[in-house]
C-alpha cells in the first residue's frame, strides 16, 4: 500500500471527504480547547454586550419618553398649549417612568454596580429614578385619577358636578410631604464618581425644590377650591357679557348678565338675560359713587349698561352686584364674585372647545364669534327683541358648550385662552373676598390684568384713554384707532411750548388746555411724554346710509353714521397730565380726588363718516418711574383685530445724556415686548426680577430655573443651563 508523502492539497476533493475530516480529528486536543474557550468567551462578551446595549437603548428611549411627556405636561399645566390630550400625556409619563425604573433595577445592573468603578453612579441613578417614581406613582397618579373622574362629567339641566376637585387639597398636601421625603433621601446619596451624574443629581434636587415651590404658589388657590365650589353652602357668581359694538370705558355696554351658582361642587349656569327692565336702587351704593358721578355722569351707576363708563372694573363689578341684589328674589343670595366676558374671550373659548350652532343655523367658532356679536347681529336682526334673544342664546350656548366640553383633552387650550384673554382685558374678575382674588391671580393662569385696574405702581407708569359711545347706534365696529407715545426733552417742556403756542398737534383745531393741578412738586415729577390718540370713522356715507337704523342711529342722530364719544383720560399713578388738546364739544371735569389719580373727562365732537379726530396730551410720570410710559385704551374691536393702546412702544427724542434716557430703553425696551403684557412687565413678576438682580443675594439653581420657566416650556434647555 503506497504511502502518500509531502503536503496534502487541501484544495482537492478529499478536503470534503473522509480524509478531510480526519485532518481535523488529528488537531491537538489543547488547540481545540483554546478555540472553544475563545469562542465561548467571545459569545459571552457578545451576549453581555448585547444585553447591556439593549438595556441602555431601552432606558434611553424611556428617558426620552419621560422628558417629552413631562415637557408636554408642563406646557399644559402652565396654559402654554399642547397638541396632546392632558390625560394621554399624564398616562405616558406614568408608563415611561415605570418602564425606566424597572429596567435600571434589573439584575444585570446589580452586577455592573458591584463589579465596576461606577457603583456609586448606578446607586445615584437608581435613587434619583426612585424619587421620581415615588412621586409619579403617588400624588401624580392621584391627580391623574382625579382628572379621569372629571373626564366623564356632562352638563345636565344646566348643571355639572365637579366635586372631585374638592379632593385636590389633600392630594397636593401629600405631594409636598413626598417631595420633602425624597429630597432627604437624595441628600444622603454618596457623591457619584462621574461628574455628569453628580450634576444631574444636583439638578434633580433643584428641580424637586422648584416643583415644591411652584406647588406652593398654587396652595392658596387649591386650598380655596372647596370654598369656591360651595363646600360651605351655595355661592353665586355673576357673569356679565360686555359688547364692544357700543363702547364703554371698561370695554363695552353690559348686554346680558347670568348667575352661576356653586353648591357642594355642583355648578349651575343660570339664564343669560337682558338688564333693561331692572329696578333702580333708591340709594347709591356708597359715598364714593357721589364722586364718581361728577366724572362719569349723574346716573351712570343706576343701569348696568352704563356702569362700564367707569374704567375701574373693581368698582363696576360691585355696582352690578349691588343692583342685581336689589332685584326681587335676589336679596338673600351670596354673590361671591363677578366675571366680565366679551366676544373676544368667548371666541377664544370656542377655539379651545369647538363650534356651537344657534337656533337659526348660524355657526359660531374661533373666527365668527367676534363679528357676530360686534356687527352681524345688528345687520342681520334689526329687531331689538330679536337681538336681545340672540345675544342671550349665544352667550348661554357658548358657556354651556364650554363647560360641557371641558375635559383633559381641552384643558390645555382652555387654560391658554383664559391666560391670554385676561392679559389683554377681555376677561375680568372681581372677588368679594380679596384673598380669593389674590389666590386666583397668583397662579399665573389668570393674568393680573384681569382685575381691570391701571398700574398703581409709580415705577411702572400707565395712562388711560377710555371711550364711551354717546350717540344712538352700534357703530364701533367701524372705529379704528392709533396711539403714539413720544418721550420729550429740552430746556422748555413740551407742555410749556404747547401752552405758549396753543398747539400740541396741528391736526387739532381747538387750543391747548392747561390741566395741571399742582398736586406734586417738581422734584416728585420725572420724565415728560406726549401722547396722541387718533380715532377714524371708517364708514363711508353710502355704507352708513345702508345700515339699519339700530346701527347708524337713524333720525335720532344729527350726523348719520357719525360717532360721538365721552373721553376719560387718567394720569399715571404718582404723575400728572399737564396739557390737553382735543376737539371738545363740552368740557367735563379735571379732578384728582378719584381713585388716587387724576381723571379728566370731556365729550368730543362728532366724527363724521370717513373723518378722523385726534387727542393729544402731555404727561409727567413720577420721578421714581423705572419703566417708560405705557398707554392703555378701551379695547377697540374691529375687522382688523383689537386695538388696546401703545403696547409699551415709545419714541425717544431724548439724547443719551439727558435725565432718564434709560427709561425709554429700560428693562423691557421701548419696543413694548413686555409692555403688551401688562405695562412693561408690571405686577407679579417684579419680585423675581428684583431678586435676580440683587448682586449680594446671588442666583442659586432654584431661582435660576424658576426664572427661566416661560411659554413654551423647554426642559432640555432648562436642564442644560443648570
Residue ranges: model-predicted function:
Residues 1-29:
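N-terminal Lys/Arg-rich, disordered targeting/topogenic segments
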Residues 2, 25, 48-645, 654, ...:
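Non-catalytic, solvent-exposed segments at the cell envelope interface
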Residues 34-50:
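Hydrophobic membrane-insertion alpha-helices, especially the h-region
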Residues 17-22, 28, 116, 696, ...:
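Coil-to-alpha-helix initiation sites in intrinsically disordered, low-complexity, charged segments
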Residues 20, 86, 179, 411, ...:
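Short amphipathic alpha-helical segments that mediate assembly, nucleic-acid/protein binding
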Residues 6, 13, 511, 656-659:
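N-terminal compositionally biased, intrinsically disordered segments and leader/signal-like regions
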Residues 650, 654-708, 713-718:
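Ser/Thr/Gly/Pro-rich low-complexity, disordered linker/stalk segments of secreted
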Amino acid at each position: 500500500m503506497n504511502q502518500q508523502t509531502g503536503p496534502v492539497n487541501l484544495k482537492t476533493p478529499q478536503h470534503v471527504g473522509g480524509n478531510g475530516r480526519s485532518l481535523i480529528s488529528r488537531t491537538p486536543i489543547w488547540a481545540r480547547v483554546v478555540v472553544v474557550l475563545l469562542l465561548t468567551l467571545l459569545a459571552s462578551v457578545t451576549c453581555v454586550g448585547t444585553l447591556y446595549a439593549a438595556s441602555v437603548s431601552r432606558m434611553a428611549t424611556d428617558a426620552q419618553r419621560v422628558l417629552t411627556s413631562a415637557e408636554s405636561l408642563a406646557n399644559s399645566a402652565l396654559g402654554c398649549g399642547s397638541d396632546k390630550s392632558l390625560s394621554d400625556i399624564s398616562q405616558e409619563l406614568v408608563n415611561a417612568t415605570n418602564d425606566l425604573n424597572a429596567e435600571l433595577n434589573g439584575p444585570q445592573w446589580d452586577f455592573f454596580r458591584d463589579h465596576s468603578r461606577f457603583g456609586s453612579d448606578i446607586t445615584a441613578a437608581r435613587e434619583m429614578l426612585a424619587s421620581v417614581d415615588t412621586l409619579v406613582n403617588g400624588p401624580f397618579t392621584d391627580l391623574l385619577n382625579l382628572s379621569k373622574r372629571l373626564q366623564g362629567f356632562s352638563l345636565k339641566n344646566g348643571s355639572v358636578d365637579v366635586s372631585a376637585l374638592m379632593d385636590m387639597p389633600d392630594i397636593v398636601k401629600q405631594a409636598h410631604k413626598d417631595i420633602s421625603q425624597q429630597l432627604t433621601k437624595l441628600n444622603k446619596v454618596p457623591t457619584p464618581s462621574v461628574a455628569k451624574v453628580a450634576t444631574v443629581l444636583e439638578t434633580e434636587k433643584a428641580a424637586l425644590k422648584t416643583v415644591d415651590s411652584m406647588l406652593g404658589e398654587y396652595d392658596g388657590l387649591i386650598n380655596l377650591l372647596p370654598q369656591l365650589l360651595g363646600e360651605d353652602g351655595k355661592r353665586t357668581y355673576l357673569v356679565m357679557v360686555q359688547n364692544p359694538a357700543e363702547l364703554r370705558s371698561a370695554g363695552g355696554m353690559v348686554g346680558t348678565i347670568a348667575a352661576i351658582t356653586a353648591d357642594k361642587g355642583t355648578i349651575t349656569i343660570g339664564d343669560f338675560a337682558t338688564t333693561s327692565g331692572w329696578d333702580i336702587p333708591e340709594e347709591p351704593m356708597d359715598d364714593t359713587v357721589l364722586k364718581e358721578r361728577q366724572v362719569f355722569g349723574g346716573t351712570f351707576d343706576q343701569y348696568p349698561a352704563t356702569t362700564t363708563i367707569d374704567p375701574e372694573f373693581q368698582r363696576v363689578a360691585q355696582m352690578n352686584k349691588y343692583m342685581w341684589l336689589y332685584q326681587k328674589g335676589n336679596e338673600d343670595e351670596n354673590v361671591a364674585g363677578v366675571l366680565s366676558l366679551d366676544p373676544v374671550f368667548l371666541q377664544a373659548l370656542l377655539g379651545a372647545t369647538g363650534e356651537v350652532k344657534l337656533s337659526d343655523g348660524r355657526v359660531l367658532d374661533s373666527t365668527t364669534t367676534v363679528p357676530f356679536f360686534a356687527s352681524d347681529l345688528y345687520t342681520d336682526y334689526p329687531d331689538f327683541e330679536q337681538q336681545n334673544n340672540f345675544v342671550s342664546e349665544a352667550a348661554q350656548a357658548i358657556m354651556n358648550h364650554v363647560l360641557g366640553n371641558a375635559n383633559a383633552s381641552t384643558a390645555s387650550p382652555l387654560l391658554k385662552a383664559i391666560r391670554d384673554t385676561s392679559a389683554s382685558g377681555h376677561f375680568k374678575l372681581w372677588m368679594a373676598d380679596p384673598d380669593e382674588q389674590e389666590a386666583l391671580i397668583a397662579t399665573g393662569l389668570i393674568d393680573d390684568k384681569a382685575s381691570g385696574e391701571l398700574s398703581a405702581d409709580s415705577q411702572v407708569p400707565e395712562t388711560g384713554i377710555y371711550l364711551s359711545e354717546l350717540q344712538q347706534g352700534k357703530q364701533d365696529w367701524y372705529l379704528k384707532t392709533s396711539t403714539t407715545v413720544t418721550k420729550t426733552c429740552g430746556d422748555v417742556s413740551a407742555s410749556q411750548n404747547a401752552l405758549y403756542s396753543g398747539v400740541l398737534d396741528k391736526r387739532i383745531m381747538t387750543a391747548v388746555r392747561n390741566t395741571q393741578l399742582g398736586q406734586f412738586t417738581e422734584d416728585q415729577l420725572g420724565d415728560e411724554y406726549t401722547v396722541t390718540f387718533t380715532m377714524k370713522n371708517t364708514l363711508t356715507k353710502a355704507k352708513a346710509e345702508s345700515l339699519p337704523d339700530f346701527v347708524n342711529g337713524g333720525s335720532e342722530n344729527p350726523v348719520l353714521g357719525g360717532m360721538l364719544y365721552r373721553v376719560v383720560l387718567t394720569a399715571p399713578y404718582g404723575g400728572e397730565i399737564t396739557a390737553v388738546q382735543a376737539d371738545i364739544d363740552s368740557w367735563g371735569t379735571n379732578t384728582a380726588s378719584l381713585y388716587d389719580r387724576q381723571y379728566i373727562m370731556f365729550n368730543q365732537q362728532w366724527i363724521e363718516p370717513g373723518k378722523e379726530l385726534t387727542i393729544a396730551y402731555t404727561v409727567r410720570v413720577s420721578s421714581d418711574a423705572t419703566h417708560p410710559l405705557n398707554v392703555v385704551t378701551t379695547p377697540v374691536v374691529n375687522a382688523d383685530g383689537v386695538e388696546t393702546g401703545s403696547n409699551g412702544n415709545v419714541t425717544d427724542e431724548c439724547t443719551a445724556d439727558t435725565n432718564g434716557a434709560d427709561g425709554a430703553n429700560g428693562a423691557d425696551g421701548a419696543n413694548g415686548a413686555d409692555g403688551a403684557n401688562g405695562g412693561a412687565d408690571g405686577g407679579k413678576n417684579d419680585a423675581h426680577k428684583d431678586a435676580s438682580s440683587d448682586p449680594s443675594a446671588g442666583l442659586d439653581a432654584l431661582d435660576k430655573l424658576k426664572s427661566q420657566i416661560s411659554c413654551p416650556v423647554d426642559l432640555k434647555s432648562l436642564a442644560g443651563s443648570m
